[in-house]
């Protein structure tokens, strides 16, 4: 039995989304800019998706923009803010545990003279709001904080941070990378004082190559992709109609039972942790109180993550040794370093990430496998 537990890297495409996308590829394949029936038929799918996401996020459809994925959404939010507000200030704040799609554009701006401050986190991966308050300045134009950490699953205090930012720095924008939370944890950006929010299709059983950027009507950022002026000039390029429609379909499926799914996965995760708790020298990373149940980070002492990963692969169990987006460029995890994982354990951490399709039977099987292979792998390591 194949057991896929790398859902934070990507998810299996929804069958309903695939069916809809196939219809669009073969029948409604027109260009949305074309002034004929084929163009209008294609445009209907974009309008329907905008309406759907506006309903999900409780915002206006004019605040929804489609991108090529989470990385583009994050880059647009950060670089677009810098381009539009650069004359007012050159200061941004982010955290020490962001995904590379946020940390890399921040590093890019820093190399061009911007002042970037990084919030530290505690041993569970949570930021300190008092530190955030102390870093806010008159020339701060953007704060970017992820909702759910992609490596350890810690959930940041987004609502409290957003309220603080808008009270202390009313002209500053608040960006949230919600790529690991969207479709799993309900979130209302306007209620949480979020100006910019990024989401990705393939993390919730939609197709790859499609993302979303919510831009609050109060926020004004510059486009970073120029051309034909599509999407009200915010993101040029012919819309990926099949991708957007598939994203919307998949989102509707997961949001239909989002709270029930959350509770079920939380129970499965807790039960799994309990069942492996008798294995010595295993540490659960992240926050016991503030976490996404869809992500479980485990440090297994004296077992190299890559060796562990391939041992599980031999059993047709698929997990991750870190963020898949950076796995082709192996380096020490900035998140694990930030939460003070001991140096000897940095290379002994794996991530199991669940989906709404994950079953009790699958996790019971994984528990049994861990009980058998970890002692065996340690025999070789400890010789």
Where are the regions that the model predicts?
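Pyridoxal 5′-phosphate
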Residues: 1-383
